[in-house]
Each structure stands twice: as C-alpha cells, then as structure tokens.
Amino acid sequence: MHVKSVTSIKKKPLVDAHGATALYQIFWQEDESGKVFRAKKPETMKSFRHFARITLEPGETNNMHTHRDAEQVYFVLRGGGTVQVGDERRTVKAGDAIFLPVGVPHGFFNTGERRTVLLLVGAKT
C-alpha cells in the first residue's frame, strides 16, 4: 500500500508551458527532474501517468497546452473558473470534473476572486 499526504509533498512551481501554477506531484511516473522511470513505480497503475494537485491564484492559468500521449481529468476541488478544451470554453466550479482527450489543446483559467484547487489525473494512451 502506498499512502502519501499532500502536506508532505514538495510544492513544485510551474513557470513553463503550464504558466505560473503550483503543482504537488502526489503519484507521478517521473522523478522531479522530469526523467521517466523505465519500470513502473510501485504506486502507479498500468496506464497511469500522474495524479496531482494544482493551485491557481486569481487571474492565473496553466496556459493552453496539449499532451500527445495522455488523456487527463481535472476535478475542481475548490474555487472555479473557465476551462477550455479545443475550441469549447465552459465555466466550472467546485465539484465539476472535466475530461481532457489526448491530443486536444486545453487550459484552465482562474477567473474568480479566490484560489482554485484542481485534482489532476492522467493516463497514457
């Protein structure tokens, strides 16, 4: 069994293609330098790629980006904003889940007045 508390995970600032967000890599198929492990880590599922928490302050975004080899789900834990998947934009709030298909540009924009917290789950395709 593998149990990790988000409070024990080192916050990783993202200031690259994902904008200035904070990422907590809870279960991740790569190490902190981005190196992908050849053998699956024991806490990961077969097609699993990552499980993380993303925080976005008001006005922040993780920028539009595409994953060529993974599909993802954002789950809004707190706050809300606008999510764009392809050409479609929708307003979302806490409790909403958004499926992000492989190869489709997507991004989350915190258009609210308080911090938004997302749960991110990804699987290789």
Residue ranges and their predicted role:
Residues 73, 99, 114-125:
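A short hydrophobic beta-strand segment most commonly corresponding to one strand
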Residues 31-40, 52-68, 102:
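Conserved short histidine dyad/triad with adjacent acidic residue
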Residues 87-102:
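Short acidic-glycine-tyrosine-enriched beta hairpin
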